[in-house]
From Swiss-Prot:
Gene Ontology BP, a term: tRNA wobble guanine modification
Keyword tags: Cytoplasm, Queuosine biosynthesis, S-adenosyl-L-methionine, Transferase
Main location: cytoplasm
Protein name according to UniProt: S-adenosylmethionine:tRNA ribosyltransferase-isomerase
Reactions mediated catalytically: 7-aminomethyl-7-carbaguanosine(34) in tRNA + S-adenosyl-L-methionine = epoxyqueuosine(34) in tRNA + adenine + L-methionine + 2 H(+)
Record pathway: tRNA modification; tRNA-queuosine biosynthesis
Subunit and partners: Monomer.
GO molecular-function term, one example from the UniProt record: S-adenosylmethionine:tRNA ribosyltransferase-isomerase activity
EC number annotated for this UniProt entry: 2.4.99.17
Keyword Lyase on entry: no
Keyword S-adenosyl-L-methionine set for record: yes
């Protein structure tokens, strides 16, 4: 399977540079089961498009100010992006991406406005293992002072005060992500209330978003691509809610590709298993979906693992045709853009 089969032309002007207000004022393309044409709705219409007894599954990770600009002991400039908490949450040990004018060596001490990071290991391809000099609330305060919101590079502006709130879901709880689970950015408290009033339930899993989600695929052969690992957790309460929904005949509606990957990664012996894990699952056409019946997702980059996942879920030809229609109709793309609801049943 070739990466070039997952390409499409996207005018630069359709890349959303800022969010809409309110969050649920974005547009929503709907791909229903079968081969019918896409429907075009507003995101606020979501309660009408789901059924009582369906279960929305959110990713409750919280984006941290993970981009750090500082210097080495020599005075040279250095940049780190904290990518993966190796101890869970805001611990001391992290996997990070780094760059500097000269190689970053094992044992180097990097300083970021008072926050220090010791380089414990060099993994190659710009990845490092680092130990920070604080954890928990002290680390959170230090990141608030020294770090920046890690907006994606296709948002061609510096992050501002609005991004601190808007590049975060309203239910974000567990700190640890270097990017937002963007399908969740469309939800508002009034929309959640309307969903609940219709009998649509919700639960949450946690996947800390890192390079496995946002790094590009190198090379054209998808079979050679290896995902970077990302840590996830499914609580016992979430696992019970998922099983109960299936038993009642309700649909599991994953909000975002990270929720899809969490649920599919945690599938064991006919059910989603509770507990922590680390996933390197690369979902591509041919994947046998077990845990997910529908998904809410944004419009993704050409030639990305995220687009490949959506094509696996909704059908490659149908999804790519829908993307071409989205371009023709002026949908907004990527993190701050519009959304798609893909239903398998």
């Amino acid at each position: 399977m070739r990466l070039s089969d997952f390409d499409f032309a996207l005018p630069e002007g359709l890349v959303a540079q800022a969010p809409v207000t309110p969050r649920d004022a974005s547009r929503l393309m709907v791909l229903a089961p079968g081969e019918g044409a896409p429907a075009h709705r507003g995101f606020a219409d979501l309660p009408e498009l789901l059924a009582p007894g369906d279960l929305l599954v959110f990713n409750d990770t919280r984006v941290i100010p993970a981009r750090l600009l500082g210097h080495k002991a020599s005075g040279g400039k250095v940049e780190l992006l904290l990518c993966e908490p190796l101890e869970g949450g805001l611990g001391r040990r992290w996997r990070a991406m780094g760059q500097a004018s000269k190689p970053i060596r094992e044992g180097a001490v990097l300083t970021f406005d008072g926050l220090e990071a010791r380089v414990d290991g060099v993994e190659g391809e710009g990845f490092y293992r680092v130990t920070l000099d604080r954890q928990g609330p002290e680390l959170e305060a230090a990141l608030g002072r020294a770090g920046r919101i890690p907006l994606p590079p296709y948002i061609r502006r510096a992050p501002d005060a609005e991004d601190a709130a808007r590049y975060q879901t309203i239910w974000a709880r567990a700190p640890g992500s270097a990017a937002a689970p963007t399908a969740g950015l469309h939800f508002t408290e009034p929309l959640l209330a309307r969903l609940a009033a219709r009998g649509i339930r919700r639960t949450a899993v946690t996947l800390h978003v890192g390079p496995g989600t946002f790094l590009p695929i190198r090379g054209d052969d998808l079979d050679l691509h290896r995902m970077h690992g990302e840590r996830y957790e499914v609580s016992p309460a979430a696992a019970e809610e998922l099983a109960a929904t299936r038993a009642r005949g309700g649909r599991i509606v994953a909000v975002g590709t990270t929720s899809v990957r969490t649920l599919e990664s945690a599938w064991r012996d006919g059910a989603v298993a509770a507990g922590p894990g680390r996933t390197e699952l690369f979902i591509r056409p041919g994947h046998p979906f077990h845990a997910v019946d529908a998904m809410v997702t944004n419009f993704h980059l050409p030639r990305s693992t995220l687009l490949v996942l959506v094509c696996a879920f909704g059908g490659q030809g149908r999804v790519l045709a829908a993307y071409r229609e989205a371009v023709a109709r002026g949908y907004r793309f990527f993190s701050y853009g519009d959304a798609m609801l893909v239903l398998r049943r």
